[in-house]
């Protein structure tokens, strides 16, 4: 049986490079988006992505990696609260695409 816990993120052991940390961030966001589209409305995911970029990157002048990190934090909280409130998705509740029927939507722009 494999260990379900996540590995120590890059940057904590002193052996990783900044590039590996950015790759880890991108992989983590993509994995979270793949899971989130099965539980949350695609409009919510898209708007959180757009507003994160508009506020953190455009208005505040933060770097793209910081903007992605803030998006990751917001989406993790949204998915956590969804599960905490009693998600029935694991038992076949809402299908792919969140609360709407149809195929799962594509991930937000820039995360393909």
UniProtKB/Swiss-Prot annotation:
Region (Binds to human NUP153) location: 61-80
Q: Name one GO molecular function term.
A: identical protein binding
List where in the cell it is found.
Virion; Host nucleus
What Gene Ontology terms for biological process does this UniProt record contain? Answer: symbiont-mediated suppression of host innate immune response; viral life cycle
Q: Name one GO cellular component term.
A: host cell nucleus
InterPro entries the UniProt entry points to: Lentiviral_Vpx_assoc_factor (IPR053711), RetroV_VpR/X (IPR000012)
In chain numbering, where does the motif Nuclear localization signal fall?
65-72
**Highest taxon listed in the record's lineage:** Viruses
Enumerate the UniProt keywords alphabetically: AIDS, Host nucleus, Host-virus interaction, Inhibition of host innate immune response by virus, Viral immunoevasion, Virion
The keyword Transferase is assigned to this record:
no
Annotated family? Belongs to the lentivirus VPX protein family.
How does the annotation summarize its subunit structure?
Answer: Interacts with the P6 region of unprocessed GAG. Interacts with host VPRBP/DCAF1, leading to change substrate specificity of the CUL4A-DDB1 E3 ligase complex. Interacts with host NUP153.
What is the stated purpose of this protein? Plays a role in nuclear translocation of the viral pre-integration complex (PIC), thus is required for the virus to infect non-dividing cells. Targets specific host proteins for degradation by the 26S proteasome. Acts by associating with the cellular CUL4A-DDB1 E3 ligase complex through direct interaction with host VPRPB/DCAF-1. This change in the E3 ligase substrate specificity results in the degradation of host SAMHD1. In turn, SAMHD1 depletion allows viral replication in host myeloid cells by preventing SAMHD1-mediated hydrolysis of intracellular dNTPs necessary for reverse transcription.
What is the protein name given in its UniProt record? Protein Vpx
Q: What is the lineage of its organism?
A: Viruses, Riboviria, Pararnavirae, Artverviricota, Revtraviricetes
């Amino acid at each position: 049986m494999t260990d379900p816990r996540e590995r120590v993120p890059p940057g904590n052991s002193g052996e990783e490079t900044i590039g590996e940390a950015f790759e880890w961030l991108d992989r983590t966001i993509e994995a979270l988006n793949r899971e989130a589209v099965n539980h949350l409305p695609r409009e919510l995911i898209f708007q959180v992505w757009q507003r994160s970029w508009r506020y953190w990157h455009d208005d505040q002048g933060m770097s793209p990696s910081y903007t992605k990190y803030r998006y990751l934090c917001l989406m993790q909280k949204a998915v956590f609260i969804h599960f905490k409130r009693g998600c029935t998705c694991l038992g076949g509740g809402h299908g792919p695409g969140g609360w709407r029927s149809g195929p799962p939507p594509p991930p937000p722009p820039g995360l393909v």
